[in-house]
Every structure is written in structure tokens, then in C-alpha cells.
């Protein structure tokens, strides 16, 4: 549904340009995250897109130790049937500005204050979760996601719920709760049969977890292959996951093939991380979340 008089709604992130999970911006700090995805909810004002003329905010998670993340421009996805009050429009517009400019502390502060005043507004909880993820506050991410899901009362669509669950899964992974993170990724995948990032998130953990009891190479390959198919083999971060999955299986030829494709199609900022992993595969070594 499209609203023509709202300036800007909110951003729901599942992966972030930060240092792991995706939320820590150093290249070495992101060893335990899975994939991430950024979705921005933006309305139109006076029939004209607010995204026009705005520089695209990029959120990457293909750091040295992380899994996939989609780089995405502003996208119009609105809660079906929701009627925004003037007060909500003002909050959404301010949050939209903060997210567009990566002002995560301001977004977190405002959303935290706002949910105390209006705990029934699920999209404020979702915005708080996104901001918390970018500030590397996984416990707050989980709390905010649970609150958003609990209070949406059917207002959130399937895409909203999928992204919330992926966001929570990444936070769980960040906290070292790998098995629970996998379960949450798979729950997100069942919510949206066509979402590649939930599948890639689970595949990343199955392929790269430090705990051998968690790793399942065959399952990782199956999930990563499906994620690659759903993304038409055009998302370098997912191809990177597929490479890690094959490496865990011991198929280093295919690991090199897919990592090479990730390098060819990846963003220039991410390529060094792909190249580093490729070096492991060329040496017949799988990638681990604690690899150096």
C-alpha cells in the first residue's frame, strides 16, 4: 500500500554496515555474524519520492569474518492498511532522516524514548532494533524485535516479519548463540519462501562456526545454493557464503570458483575480504569464524 502524504516511515535493518551483524565496523571484529539485509520503509510526499536526489546509504557486511549482506537503496514497503497519525508521521520523518544519514545513536535514542511513550507502535520497536544492531547492541536488538513482533497485531507484512527474524538471528549469532541463531534464521526462511538472506545466514553458521558440532557442510551447501538461486547468483555476499559452504565440505575447487565470482561482482570495499578468504581455499583450508 502506498501513502502519498508521509514524509518517511522507518528503516528495518538486518545486517548493517557496522561491525557485525552485522554491526561492528572493524574488519577483524566481525567473526561471528551471519548475513544481513537493510530494508527501508519510505513513503512519498506530495506524490514525489523522497528518495529522489538522496544519496544512497550503503550497508555492507562482507567484512573479513562476516557472512552476506545486501546493499540496498531506499525501498517502499509499507505495513498493509496502517493509518499513520500526524504524530507518527513526525516521528517517522525524523527517524528516516537519522537512518538516511547513518545517525545511529540519534535513531536509537529517539526510538528508545518513543517506544516508552508509545509501546504499542511496533514499527518504533523495529526502528530501535535496527539502530541497536548498527550500534552493536545485540541484547537490545533481541528485545526490540520481540517487542515489534508481539505488538504488530497483524500490521506487519510477511517481509517485515522475515526481516525482524533475520535481525534477531544475527544478534543471537553475535552473542555466540549459534544453534538458536540457526533456528531463527530457518524460522525466517519459512516465513518468506523467497528470501535468500535468511537461508544464507543459516548456511554461513553451518559452514563457518568454530564449534565442529554445529558445522554441517552438506546442509550449508544446500541452503547457500538455494539462497544463490533466489538472488539469481547476482549477490556477491551470498556467493561468498556458497564458497564457504563448499570449503567446509572439502570441495575447494568449487569454493574457489564461487569466491572468484564474488570477487568479480562484489563491491570494491568488500573485495579485499573475499580475496582473503580465497587465499584460504587456495591453500585447501576452510574458513572459520575465528580465522585470522
Predicted regions and their residues:
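Terminal, low-structured helical/coil segments at or just beyond the last alpha-helical repeat
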Residues: 67-84, 214-218, 226, 232-292
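Register position in tetratricopeptide repeats
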Residues: 100-101, 134-135, 174, 208, ...
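Residue-level recognition of tetratricopeptide repeat
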Residues: 96, 130, 170, 204-211, ...
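Short coil turns that delineate tetratricopeptide repeat
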Residues: 85, 119, 153, 159, ...
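Alpha-helical segment of the N-proximal tetratricopeptide repeat
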Residues: 86-117
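Canonical tetratricopeptide repeat
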Residues: 127, 160-163, 167, 201, ...
Amino acid at each position: 500500500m502506498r501513502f502519498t502524504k508521509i514524509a518517511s516511515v522507518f528503516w528495518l535493518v538486518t545486517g548493517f554496515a557496522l561491525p557485525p551483524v552485522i554491526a561492528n565496523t572493524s574488519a577483524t571484529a566481525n567473526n561471528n555474524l551471519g548475513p544481513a539485509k537493510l530494508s527501508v520503509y519510505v513513503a512519498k510526499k506530495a506524490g514525489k519520492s523522497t528518495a529522489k536526489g538522496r544519496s544512497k546509504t550503503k550497508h555492507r557486511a562482507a567484512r573479513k569474518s562476516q557472512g552476506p549482506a545486501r546493499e540496498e537503496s531506499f525501498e517502499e514497503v509499507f505495513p498493509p492498511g496502517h493509518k499513520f497519525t500526524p504524530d507518527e508521521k513526525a516521528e517517522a520523518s525524523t527517524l528516516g532522516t537519522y537512518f538516511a544519514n547513518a545517525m545511529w545513536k540519534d535513531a536509537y535514542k529517539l526510538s528508545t524514548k518513543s517506544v516508552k511513550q508509545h509501546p504499542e507502535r511496533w514499527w518504533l520497536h523495529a526502528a530501535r532494533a535496527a539502530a541497536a544492531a548498527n550500534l552493536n547492541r545485540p541484547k537490545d536488538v533481541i528485545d526490540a524485535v520481540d517487542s515489534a513482533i508481539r505488538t504488530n497485531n497483524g500490521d506487519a507484512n510477511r517481509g517485515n516479519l522475515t526481516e525482524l527474524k533475520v535481525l534477531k538471528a544475527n544478534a543471537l549469532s553475535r552473542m555466540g548463540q549459534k544453534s538458536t541463531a540457526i533456528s531463527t534464521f530457518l524460522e525466517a526462511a519459512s516465513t518468506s519462501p523467497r528470501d535468500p538472506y535468511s537461508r544464507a545466514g543459516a548456511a554461513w553458521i553451518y559452514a563457518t562456526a568454530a564449534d565442529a558440532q554445529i558445522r554441517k557442510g552438506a546442509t550449508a551447501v544446500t541452503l547457500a545454493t538455494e539462497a544463490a538461486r533466489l538472488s539469481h547468483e547476482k549477490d556477491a555476499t551470498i556467493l561468498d557464503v556458497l564458497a564457504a559452504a563448499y570449503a567446509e565440505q572439502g570441495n575447494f575447487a568449487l569454493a574457489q570458483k564461487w569466491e572468484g565470482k564474488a570477487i568479480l561482482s562484489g563491491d570494491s570495499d568488500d573485495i579485499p575480504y573475499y580475496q582473503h578468504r580465497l587465499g584460504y581455499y587456495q591453500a585447501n583450508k576452510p574458513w572459520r569464524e575465528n580465522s585470522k
